[in-house]
Structure formats: C-alpha cells, structure tokens
Amino acid sequence: MATDGASCEPDASRAPEEAAGATAEAARKEFDVDTLSKSELRMLLSVMEGELEARDLVIEALRARRKEVFIQERYGRFNLNDPFLALQRDYEAGAGDKEKKPVCTNPLSILEAVMAHCRKMQERMATQLAAAESRQKKLEMEKLQLQALEQEHKKLAARLEEERGKNKQVVLMLVKECKQLSGKVIEEAQKLEEAMAKLEEEKKKTNELEEELSAEKRRSTEMEAQMEKQLSEFDTEREQLRAKLNREEAHTTDLKEEIDKMKKMIEQLKRGSDSKPSLSLPRKTKDRRLVSISVGTEGPLTRSVACQTDLAIEGTDHVKKSPLTVPGKPSPGSAKGSVCANAAHVRPGMDRQASHGDLTGSSAPSLPPASANRIEENGPSTGSTADLPSSTAPAPGSAAQSPVAAALGPAHSAQSPCTPAPAQPGLNPRVQAARFRFQGNANDPDQNGNTTQSPPSRDVSPTSRDNLVAKQLARNTVTQALSRFTSPAVGAAPRPGAPPTGDAGAYPPVGRTSLKTPGVARVDRGNPPPIPPKKPGLSQTPSPPHPQLKVIMDSSRASNAGAKVDNKTVASPPSSLPQGNRVISEENLPKSSSPQLPPKPSIDLTVAPAGCAVSALATSQVGAWPAETPGLNQPACSDSSLVIPTTTAFRSSINPVSASSCRPGASDSLLVTASGWSPSLTPLLMSGGPAPLAGRPTLLQQAAAQGNVTLLSMLLNEEGLDINYSCEDGHSALYSAAKNGHTDCVRLLLNAEAQVNAADKNGFTPLCAAAAQGHFECVELLIAYDANINHAADGGQTPLYLACKNGNKECIKLLLEAGTDRSVKTRDGWTPVHAAVDTGNVDSLKLLMYHRAPAHGNSLNEEEPESDVSDLDDGEESSEGESKPVVPADLINHADREGWTAAHIAASKGFKNCLEILCRHRGLEPERRDKCNRTVHDVATDDCKHLLENLNALKIPLRISVGEIQSGNYGSSDFECENTICVLHIRKQTSWDDFSKAVSQALTNHFQAISSDGWWSLEDTAFNNTADSDIGLSLDSVRAIMLGSVPWSAGQSFTQSPWDFMRKNKAEQVTVLLSGPQEGCLSSVAYASMIPLQMLQNYLRLVEQYHNVIFHGPEGSLQDYIVHQLALCLKHRQMAAGFSCEIVRAEVDAGFSKEQLVDLFISSACLIPVKQSPVKKKIIIILENLEKSSLSELLGDFLAPLEIRSPESPCTFQKGNGTSECYYFHENCFLMGTIAKACLQGADLLVQQHFRWVQLRWDGEPMHGLLQRFLRRKLVNKFRGQAPSPCDPVCKTIDWALSVWRQLNSCLARLGTPEALLGPKYFLSCPVVPGHAQATVKWMSKLWNAVIAPRVQEAILSRASVKRQPGFGQTTTKKHPSQGQQAVVKAALSILLNKAVLHGCPLPRAELDQHTADFKGGSFPLSLVSNYNSCSKKKENGAWRKVNTSPRRKSGRFSSPTWNKPDLSNEGIKNKTISQLNCNKNASLSKQKSLENDLSLMLNLDPRLSLGSDDEADLVKELQSMCSSKSESDISKIADSRDDLRTFDSSGNNPAFSATVNNPRMPVSQKEVSPLSSHQTTECSNNKSKTEPGVSRVKSFLPVPRSKVTQCSQNTKRSSSSSNTRQIEINNNSKEENWNLHKNEQTHRKT
C-alpha cells in the first residue's frame, strides 16, 4: 500500500499541472502584446522582472537540492536506515534495465524541462521587448517633429500678421492714388469736351468745304460731260463726213470708169465695130446695182436663181404660187449672190394652239419687206427670209405662230445630183471662197450669223452618224446651189408653168430616180394627180396640224449615186410648206409594212426641178409622236435629229420612268398607217402591225391613247358619246392622251369640255400623268384649263412630286410658275425636294430652290420651252450666286418617316452636286440626326464627307512677302512685294500642329515648284541646266509669319483653335516674311529676283574678299539691282558687327571725268591722305553704267592703288580744283561697278585683270533660268497657288515668251552682234492673262518695236557700215546707210521675227497673221536673202566678229570652196526666181500682192546692192545660212513646219546655197580646234588672246577664269548642240571651234 501511495503521488500532482498548463495555453493564445497600453507594458515588465528574480532563486534552490539528491542517490542507497531506499534498490536489481521503470519522476528531467521552457519564454519576451523599444523610439521622433512643426506654425503666423499690416498700408496708398487719378480723369474729361467742341467746329468747316468742293466737282463733271458730248458729236460728224467722202470718192471712181468706158464705146462706135461690147455696160451696171447695199431709202433688189436644190420664189402674192423663173445664164454680178442653205433661221415648229383646217389652200411664201431683206457680205440673198403666214386664224386665247421657212431648203438626198465643177479662173473670188467654205466646213455660221444648231431636246439622242448625215446634207445643198454659178447646169430645167406639187400618197419621195429603196416606188416628175374631194367629216371643222408621216429615205453619205444603203426615217414639220423641212434620222427602224394609201386632200408635195429628192411629206398621220420641243428654233439639217417612234407605252398606272425609258423609240404600240379613204375605221385601226389595246372598250379611248386626231375629232362630233367614260383602271380618254403626250388630242378633249381633274383608281389625274411622263405641252394645256396643280394622289404624290421624281424640268418650271405648293408631303413624308435629290437631278433641285413664281398670273407662250433651257443653263447658275433660295429652311430640313432629310439622301447616294446645292442654303442643318441617331456626315460617302468637312472651312491665302522693294532706280519695277503661293483650308478640327505642318509643307512645295523644271521642258536640250536650278530657299529662310496682324512662329500654339483664332482676329491672309538685307541675309533678294541664294552669297563673298568687283552682262541683266541689294546686305552686316557703314552711289555718263571720280573718292573717305590715319568707317562705292565711259581713261590711274591698299604705295591725284596730293585707298572701302555690255574692247581690256569680274551671261546661271522661274512664280500667283496643267494655253504662252528670249539671243549671237543681246529684265513684264494669249502677243509686238528692233537695227548697221579695207587707216561709220545696208537690216529683222519671235506662237495662224502687221520689219521678202550672193571679196580679210559671248561662239571666217566658188562670186544676184514657201493657205491675196510689190521693189534695187565691205557680205551669208538651216541647235531645234515657220530654199541654179544640213552633234577631234596650220587659209585673230603678261592685249572676250584655259580643248569634244559651239562649213564637213578668252595669241601673230 505504501508503494501504491508513493507511486500515486506524482500522478495526483501531475493532473493539476496539466490543467493549469492547458489554461495557460488558452490564456496565451488570447494574450496579445501589441494591444497592451504603455502602463500595462510597464506592469508586465515589472512582473517579468520579478519572475526572473524568482526563477533565479528557484534555480539556486534546485541546484542545492540536486546536489543533495545526487549525493543521496550515489551514496544513500547503502543507508540501512531508510526502508524505502532498500525497496527501491531491490526493485531495480530484480529485473533488467529496459524493463524497469523508475518508481518516481527524476527531478533532473523535470528541472531541465522547466529550464527549457523558461529559455523559450525569455527569448519571446526579448523580442517583444525589442519591438516595444522600437515603437517607443518612433513615437519620440514623431513628438520631436510635431514640436518643430508647431514652432514653424508660430513663425508663419507671425509673418502673416506682419504682411497683413504691410498690405493695409499699401491699400491705403492705393486708395489715395485712386482719388488723385479720379481727379485727373475729371480734368481730362473737361479737356476732352473742349477738344470735341473744337472738333465739331472743324467738322462744320470741313463739311462746308466738302459741299463747296462737291459743287465744284459737279460743275466740272457737267463741263466734262458737255465736252464729251461735243467730242462724240464731232467724232460722229467726222466719221459721217469720212464715210460721205469715201462714198463720193467711190462714186467719182465709178463715174470715171463710166466715162472711160463711154469714151471707148464712142470710139468703137466711130470705128464701126459690132454692137456686142456695148451690151455689156447695162448688164454690168445692173450687176453693180445688185451688189450694192440697200439703204433705207432704196428698195431691195433681189434676183431669183433656180438651181437643182432650191425653189426660186418671187413675188408678193399671198394667195397663188408664182411660177419658177429660170435665168438663162447667171452673170458674174449675180454669182455673188448668197445661196447659203441656212440663210434664214428656220423655225418650223408645231403650232400647238392654232388649228389648220384646209391644208390644200396653203398660201405661197412671199418676199419679206424691204427692211427684212438683209443683203449680206457676199451679195443679195435669193429670197432668204420668206414669211409663210398661217392660212387659218389661231385658236382663241392662243398666240399664233407664223412658221418661217427658208427659200433654199435643206438637201433632200445624201448624194448631190451633180458633181460641182472646179472654180473657173474667170469666176468671182467670193463665189469660189463660198464654195470652198461650205465644202470644207459644215458648222460655219450662216449669213445671218446664226449657227444651225437645234436646241437641246430631252428625247433626242443623236449619234455621230446622224450628225454627219445632217451636215453632209447641208453641205451638198450649198455645193449644188453654188454649182449653178460656177459650172454648167446639169439636167433639164423644170417647166415654168408646172406647179411644184406631186403625187405623194402611194409614192413616198426618194432621193433620185436611180436610188433604190425597198418597198417604195419612184417619184415621177409630171403634173400632180387630181385632188380627191374632202371627207365629209372634216370639210367644215378646222382640224389641228397633223402629226408627221414616216417616210423612208436614203440619207447615207455614199458618194456614188444609186448605192443601196440603210433606211433612215425622215419626217417633215406639221405644215404643208415645201421649205423649212427637218431631216429626222433614226438608226434601227424596221422595214415599213404599213399599207400604201392614196393621198389625202391636204398633201402638198414639192418635187425638186433637176431630180433632187423632196424632203418630206406634210400630211396627217395616225399614231405619230409629236415633236418634243415645239416652238424651238430647229433649222433644217439640224445636228439634233428628232426620232419618230414606232410604239407608244401604255399602262394602267403611272410608274416612274427614266428619261431614256420615256423616249418614243422605247414604247410598246403605235399605229403607223395614215388615215385616208378606208371605208371602215375599225379594220384601218387594226391593220398595219399594232396590237389591239386591252381593256379599252371604246374607240374614243383608243384614238386618244394612240394620238389619232382624225378619228378622235370624228368621234367627238358624234352625239351621245360620253367623253368622260373611264375604263376599269379609271383611265379616261383625257388621261390616256395626256399620259402619251398627244397634245392635239388633249386640246380637242379639253375643248369638248372633258373633266380635267378626273382621277383614276390610284388618284392620278391627267396632269399627274403628263407631269410624270414629261409631256410639258400637255401640262401647259391642262394648267391653262384650270387643272388642279396641287392634287395629291392616294399616296400623296402631287404633279410637282412626279415631275421631280422623273427629272422633267420643263414640267417643273411650268408647275412652279403656276404657283404649285412645294411643301406637300407624301405618305412616307417625302417632299418634292426629296424626290429631286433621290434621282440626283441637279436641274430639278435648282428649279425647286431658286425658281420664283411670277407675281401676276402665268403668261404661257410658245417660246417658253426655249426659255426653259436657257433659264436652266444660264439663269439659274447666275441666280445661285446672286439671288437667295425661295425654299424655307423647314422644307430643306424636313425629315421623312425614317428621319432622313434631303441631305441624308444626297450624302448616302453620293450625289455631291445635289449636296453642294443643299449646303448653299443657309438654313441647312447638317447635324440633324435621323431615328438611328445618324447625322448627314455619318451616312455620307467619301466624296460627300469631304464636302461636308470643308463646308465651314476657312480659305486663307498664304502669301510670301519680301518687304518693300524700291522700284524704278534699280531695275526692280517688275518685282512683286507679295506672292500668293496657295490657299490654306482651316477647319474647325484643325489643330495648331496641323496648321504648322500645312504652312511648312506649302512653303517647301512652293520653293521646289518654282525651282524644278516641271513642265518647262523646252525642245532644246542644251538649255536644260538642272544642276543650278534650285534657288536654295527653305524654311530657314523665313523670318516671321503673320496671321493677319498677329505674329506667329511655326510650332506656336494659342489657346484658341486656328479656326476660332482666324475668325476672331479677322485674319484674311497668312503672310510669310523672308529674311532680307536688313537681317544680313539674302533670302528675300533671292525670292524677289529668282537668283539662286548660293550665287548671291558667292557674290557677297567676292565683294567682302576682293573689295573690287564689277558685274557685267547684256543690258537688262539686273546688274544694278544685284549690286544695290548686295550693298544693303553688306551694310547691315557691318553695322551688326559694330561698324558704321555708308553707301555712295554714282551714275556714270559720257561726261563723267576722272577728276569727278577723284572728288567722289575723297569726299566719301575712300581716298585718304598719306599723313592721315585710316578711318574705321566702312564705305561702299557703287559705280553704275560704266559702259558709258572709257574704263581705261576713268579707272586707269586707280588700278595700282586699288590693288595695293596701304600708305606704303601712295599715288598722287589731282583734284577738281587743280590741286594734287598723295592719297591711298584704305582697307574699309568696297568698290562695285556695273557694265551693261557683254564684252570689252581695245584699251578697256587692260582694266579687267585688276578687278574681280562677275559675268552675267544670258546662256548661263543665274540669268538663264531666272526668266523661267520668275514667270512660273508669276503664274502661280495669278492662279492663287494652283499651277495649271502643261496643256493650258497660258502655259504655252509663257513657254513661247521664254523661247522668244532664248532664240532671239541665240540668233543675235550667231549674227555676231553681241551688243544687241538682251537680259531677262525686259521680259519680266510678260502679262499672264488666262485665256487671252492675244494680250501677250500685243505686249511682244510693243517690246519688239520699242526695244528689240531698234537695238537690232543699230547693231546690224554698225556692223555692216564698218569698213576695214587696207586703204583706210581707221574705222569709219556711215551716217546715212546705203540701200544695200538697209536691205540687210530689213532682212535681219524679218529673219529674227520669223525664226525667234513668231515661231512657236500659241495663237492660231489666222490670228497670228492679224498681229504680224504690228511687228516692225515683218513684210520683207526673205527670198531675196536666200538668192543673194555676195560679190568677190578677199580671202585674207580681217575678221569682223570682234567679240562674242553667246552660246554660238564664232570661229574665224573660213574661206572654204563652198563659200568662194568663182561661178558664184560672178553670178551676183542674177537668179531672181522667188521661192517663197509660205504654205499658209489662209493668206489673203492682198498680202501676197503687197509682198510681190515689195519684192519687185527690192529686185529693182539689186544692181545697186554692191556692198561696200566684206562685213555686209558676211552678214548676207550668215542670214542665208540662217534661212536655209533647219537643224539649228541654238534656236531650240526649230521644227520644219510650213505652217509655223516660213522656210526659204535657194533655187537650183545656185548650188552654193543649197541647204547643206550638217549634223550638229558630230563629235569633233582635237585637231580641228588646234591653231590653224599654214595650209588653212583662215585667219582667227579675233579668237586669240595672250596668256603671257608681257604681250599687249589687242582683242579679247570678257573674262574667263584662267583655271578654265586647260579645259577648253576638252570641251570642244562635246557635241555641237552645246551652248559653246557653232556650225561652220569646210568642204561640206561639220567642224567647230571653241572660242576661249585666253588662247595663245602668238598663233595669230604668226599667221
């Protein structure tokens, strides 16, 4: 038991420990150190410290206990006093070690477990303690920061208080100042009132002065008006007196001729000669009387002439026809009579309101009154405008139209029955010209100035073949008529008493009796058959004009008579008159199968006398389609041919059809048989091919639908007939007639009181049907009979809606003028505007929007359809820009069921034109949305989107400004300050970046456009120097950009968008300012003058580097402008560097002396005395016009001081007052000069090595491309940045002006006259007038007469009059040129004019011939030059060509066998055969006559043309070679065109001047340009120039750099088309020689 009790103690004690441990575990889980407060943490820390102390005590106690236990366990087991130990010892010794369990727990293990647990707790508490310490530190730092912030807050609060105090003081001061300022304002207001009062007084005074001035102005204006009136009266009286004088002179001349003739007749009578010559006098007198123009007091003298194609009608009887009068033989006087087929403007149209009853009694045409008989240029017209009055009275309320027909009808056959004979020599040239005119051109205007073009018809679709047929018919007619005057008559004349009628019922007319037409009999000439009696039903009632009858006729263009060709359809106008016919053609018509009927009583067929075809029949026709444009002027042989339909469309309801589907040729049924003598009407209607019309029980509807006027009128005369009967579809007879466009039937039914507003089952009235089908005549009739113009069908369609839907503009206009409502909507919500836009019909939409209804009623007349066309084509376009739309904004913006407006429809279908018209209406709402929330832009196509985006875009011109240009003094009068380069489109969504990119891109494109060659591809490839074409401008050249008046730079942005900014600031343009001389740059100079910037900078560098520079070139090379701009730029550069600078300009003339130049240098501080120190001031001296004085005399003494500028090399100069002193040039002096001369001569050449020379050659940059670039920029400015296409006439005109300058200089260079070369300055003023090339030609003529011709004349005379014969020691010039020299000058001017100026002119040859007379020297006979050969001359004579800087540099004169054959030198001017090869067929005889007279005059001078010098002979030979040359490389490869250039060939007897064409591109070897050897009899002294300084320079060219001397031999290997070569002839071989300025002159001395 003791053992059990002992063993249970530990167990009993372990259970509470485990329970306490579990409780502690749960408490530990709930315990969280982070949630404890500071005080709790401190308490916990103290508790843990106490526990640590207790733990230390426990550990010490346990150590002591352990020691005791250890001793006991080790040594106590052997103690016999303790029985428990004995028992334990026995227990342990009794069993094995593994099986034994301790009796009680070992205290050491317990202690170790407790210690491990305590270590863990200690570590955990240490970590928690460290975390608590870190949080404590962070908290303390936050406290420190909080304290610092509190201190700063206090400081700021203190400062704020201080600032408030200061602000209070400032506010008090401002209040005081405001009080003071208010007092001042009051004082200023008082002063302003006083000033205003004074201003009012001044205004009153100025008003009084203005009134007095206006009164004086009125008086002066009245005086001027009186003066003008008197001047005009004087002018009128002077003209009248002149005219009277001319008439008296002409009358005197005639009387003189009569006297001479009478004298001759008296002499002949005295001699007893026969009396035949005496008969010619009255005849000629009569002829002259016929040709004379009739004045108001004279009666018209006409003469009737019958020919094979016309009917001569004479007399004034209106009741009976006059017999034909045939003269036996036309006299020359009557041959001048005008026989144009289109002499009268024929107007045969259908009289819609007049009814013709008795057609058999048609009156004969009568001659017009004296005032209407107009005699044209070619003589009196033979009954040209005959009036054919109507034989019946017009219907009441209608305007009667009198048909007018031409006396000479159109050609009735495609073939001319007689071949016109060629013009005889004895005929009058006017008749020959008329024959040539009408044979050559069928579109020429007639005698009255009218062109025979018919008005456009909607249903007419002529083909080119139809037009050719009509033109050929007119042409043949006139040819046949003229053949009566120019050739014997062919065929027998008709019997005088035979009336011009024939059997035309069963015998349709054909062209000739030999022409074959299937199914048609021939027309037999003879008396007409007896006229059968009239029908009973038609005898009393006047019937309307009948539709046309289809007649088959041969109208091909075959030249052989009798050829079998395709059938054509010809119809006559609805009148029985023989003239005024219309030729109507249609391509695909079936063969006629209608029965042949006897003629009606009203047939009046005219048979031509000599076998020509009759034009057409004027008879009644069943089922004919009326003319679409009655009342229009449609002459015979019209280009637009009407089409006779074969069928008529007929349906039960109105369906919208297109313009093509409502053409007559596309319909379904037609009765083509002519109503005549048939006993039964029903078989007549059913025969001939047409199918019976279904659903039409009555003949009335059938006749109305088919347009059978005869049947309809008969039925209407019957009693008891219901004319308003409607079929099952609701169609009445009036409806059917209106739908099919039968105007006459509609008129009959309306006169019979048919219901005008009867509707069918769909609600369509006859007016709806006519408007839908486009029958505007029916619409006009129905409106006149009070039809309801606003009637709406079941679907809401009004007549206006239907007309707009089908694009029938004539109907639309009639309805609008009648006052129809434009705002009626359909069931779907569509208005007429929707309908017009839906079909894309622009004309209909224009009418709806702009056409105004008349204020007082509607006046309808027969010429209304014609005015329709003109109003629509011309008037409406003008009204768009001037008048406002009459349509309100609500109608434009009206939406249908789907919410779509008219703009939605136009945009979605891509009808850009319609959308543009809608957008012009200010009330349009493009942002309006449909029911799907879509705007117009959302549903638009790409094109329409672009249009909508640009709708409100601002169009701002972009201009480049170069600043103010001083004009007049420096040759810059033609330069423009500003140039428009493009137009910027600024939209609402445009950003500043987009705007900046657009401006930059526009500038870049513009600079490239004016620099590149582009379409300026001239024929001469030698001028295409593209290497130096770039002018060097870029965006860096821009100084500033002005948006109106606001400066702006690229990339800068404002708060407003560009669109808002431009509108707010009212910026009308964007100006780009280029950097100019004021900024030390030359960009503006380069742009103004079109000289490349790189070259200008190079010139400026030469001035700065060498100080002495002279610019020289031909006159007009802009030397003065360049020098002045360089001086300005240099001045501003020096001023920017801190130096003062001054420009001194002096003009040199012939009287400018060296002493004056010395005074100029001294006064400007360029020449400084040796004793004086140099100044720091910069001086720029400009000497202009140095060519007017001798350079060697003027600058000879200054050469050395200018080269060496220092006090060590002084020079003594004499002043103007006579004193002299030593001076020197200082370094700060710049000297620039200008010379308007291409080369130097004589002693002046000594000056050239002391200066730096800038040569402005016309064939090199910058001058060569300057004119091209300048004119291109001028053109771009004219077209506001949009350069036209190369095919535009204005581009060709500019090309011509450019080529004139180049070819002119090339020809002048070849003639050896460099002093006549011109710079581009004179051509800068070339006018750029689009569409008026005549202005440029007139300008060119003025330039030629004022500048070019005098210079050429002076240069040629100075060269031709210089003699260098051995007997004379010096050069002499003749004051009065000989006749030979004058001939040479005239020849040179004429050749230059033809080869350089007139060649390539864009005007037609006929217009150019009119302007040729304005050019001086254009009438010289050039063939004289071609046949001229100079007299004998010496071979070794000195060369006359002193200098030449042209591209065709001259070699020495070669004495080759070709130029010096003995037979040629002896021949002189023996050959007088004139080979004037001007192949211009339009040249008048008078010009040729004057040319021959001039030529004969020159030939009379031939014996005296022995030229006194060899230079004249050289000139003549040079002119001859220029005339014969056709492959000149330096004249832009002038084409061998006989029409554009007058070429000249020498005769066969003169082989020396036969044009030997050399190959200008043949390579030349080095031997050919070497110095000439001894066997060559050529002297090239003027080519050589020294290269050694010791040899004096006698003759030279202006300078070429010495570095180029070595390149000369290589340059000569190039082709001769280059600008430095020339063609010469040596033994028929093409050889050439380069002229160089620095060749070795010793070769010249050896020769």
From Swiss-Prot:
Query: Record's Pfam families?
Result: AAA_lid_NAV1, Ank, Ank_2, CortBP2
Name the residue ranges with Low complexity bias: 362-372, 389-411, 488-509, 1609-1623
State where composition is biased (Polar residues).
379-388, 440-466, 569-579, 1544-1559, 1567-1584
Q: Pinpoint the residue ranges of every ANK repeat in the record.
A: 695-725, 729-758, 762-791, 795-824, 828-857, 898-928
The entry's localization annotation reads: Cytoplasm, Cell cortex; Cell projection, Dendritic spine
Q: Could you tell me which residues carry Phosphoserine?
A: 1509
Residue list for modification Asymmetric dimethylarginine: 484
Query: Where does the source fall among the domains of life?
Result: Eukaryota
Q: Where is the composition biased (Basic and acidic residues)?
A: 1630-1647
Q: Where do the record's region annotations for Disordered lie?
A: 1-27, 202-222, 318-427, 440-468, 482-604, 856-886, 1436-1467, 1542-1647
The molecule here is called Cortactin-binding protein 2
